[in-house]
């Protein structure tokens, strides 16, 4: 039997930053900054917040679709688990499992998550914005993930 809190999370009934924190979106939850005013959790090069998006870019695509970047096709999962990202020393990072679990819960409710790549002017970086709807139609979990040096090849031979 599920608890009431478990049912709320299963339905993506999330309304504040405390509920986001309980979902443990980051590898090390001791190294986060909480912005209560903006319902936002800040970590190293990424954030998770609960809010009404100002707008969802027209370039956003469904989380189940592939995206073409630099003449290569990627799934969202491939981008989240990218070895280019994890080979860098990170003090903190967004857990890909958190994102994929949220997407799975939302898709079971016949809702659609969207993501887009935003151009920040740095050719070697990758910026991903995700929009995950909650049970409230106007409230989303908004995730921003910034990967520095994503396109720089680094090899380590042992």
UniProtKB/Swiss-Prot annotation:
Organism annotation: Vaccinia virus (strain L-IVP) (VACV)
What does the record say about induction? Expressed in the early phase of the viral replicative cycle.
Which one Pfam family would you cite for this protein? Pox_F15
Q: What is this protein called?
A: Protein OPG060
Q: Which domain of life is it from?
A: Viruses
Q: Which UniProt keywords apply?
A: Early protein
The similarity annotation says: Belongs to the orthopoxvirus OPG058 family.
- Gene symbol here is OPG060
User: InterPro entries under this entry?
Assistant: Poxvirus_F15
């Amino acid at each position: 039997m599920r608890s009431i809190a478990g049912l709320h999370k299963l339905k993506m009934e999330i309304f504040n930053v405390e509920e986001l924190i309980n979902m443990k979106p980051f590898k090390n939850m001791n190294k986060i900054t909480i912005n209560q005013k903006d319902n936002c959790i800040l970590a190293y090069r990424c954030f998770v917040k609960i809010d009404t998006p100002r707008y969802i870019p027209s370039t956003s695509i469904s989380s189940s679709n592939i995206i073409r970047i630099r003449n290569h096709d990627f799934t969202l999962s491939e981008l989240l688990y990218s070895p280019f990202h994890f080979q860098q020393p990170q003090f903190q990072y967004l857990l890909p499992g958190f994102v994929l679990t949220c997407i799975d819960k939302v898709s079971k409710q016949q809702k659609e998550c969207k993501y887009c790549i935003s151009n920040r002017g740095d050719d070697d970086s990758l910026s991903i914005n995700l929009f995950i709807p909650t049970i409230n139609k106007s409230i989303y979990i908004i995730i921003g993930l910034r990967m520095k040096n994503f396109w720089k090849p680094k090899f380590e031979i042992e």
